[in-house]
Amino acid sequence: MKLPIFIADAFTATAFRGNPAAVCLLERTLEEDAHQQIAREMNLSETAFIRKLQPTDSFTQSSRFGLRWFTPVSEVPLCGHATLASAAVLFHKIQNRNSTLTFVTMSGELKARRAEDGIVLDFPVYPTFPQDFHEVEDLIKAAIGDTLVQDIRYSTDTRKLLVRLSDSYDRSFLESLKVNTEPLPAIEKTGKVRGLILTVKGEPGGQTAPYDFYSRYFAPWVGIAEDPVTGSAHTVLSSYWSQQLRKKEMRAFQCSRRGGELDISLRPDGRVDIKGGAVIVLEGTLTA
């Protein structure tokens, strides 16, 4: 087995920042177990597998492909940064000629289109609903202790818990906050929660670039203690902060150690455009 494989840093214009994803190009069907084995070997938060939908398709000419995403421990239904990385590989390395690519996925058809300063992902928007604090109190206290919480929401579509911290906290507080993810899967084992979003309101600017909101994302339930930059989490965050800020156009920053920027535009058709950059940092051949 020889497979072309790449690593791209997504949601960044600079190498070694953003969120790295492995991207594997499949000329033919791969044995089912091999997807997980390769993802475990790559040991990144996600490995993406792009496959041809028809034997006559071409990675350089076709505009529709199948796409799946695997963490080191399981397949996931949606991954934004690995979709961005996949589009970057096809556009910039494979020299695909199309302006828009369509990926057939577990979350339906997702589109990625070229932009002057990045790649725009066309994703669904997932609403959030008020969550009773007492139902998730043990989970939140285990993760962030006595940190003040302003709002708690739950996304039934994505099984993500969104915790908005007090507006008295700023970016530096969120960045330095020690989050204990190790006990979370044992505390929440019903399957209701598969990801934890922590978020704070942004600031008007000053000496730093203005962002509408900041976030961090944790998914120990699928083997990811903290994800550097998470496109799928922003399908939830965009819905929440659009309502809170009464804005359709927003700029977001995910406050992981690597950090990443996302430009968000909510559309009239109930979907969201998420724009980001990507830098390909490695290309090679998987020979196992």
UniProtKB/Swiss-Prot annotation:
InterPro entries: Phenazine_PhzF-like
Active-site residues per Swiss-Prot or TrEMBL entry: 46
Enzyme Commission number(s) of this protein: 5.1.-.-
Pfam family, one: PhzC-PhzF
Keyword Hydrolase assigned: no
Keyword Isomerase: yes
GO molecular function: isomerase activity
Membrane-spanning intervals of the chain: none
GO aspect biological process, one term: biosynthetic process
Keywords on record: Isomerase
Similarity comment: family membership: Belongs to the PhzF family.
Identification of the protein by name: Phenazine biosynthesis-like domain-containing protein 1
Species per Swiss-Prot/TrEMBL record: Mus musculus (Mouse)
Gene: Pbld1
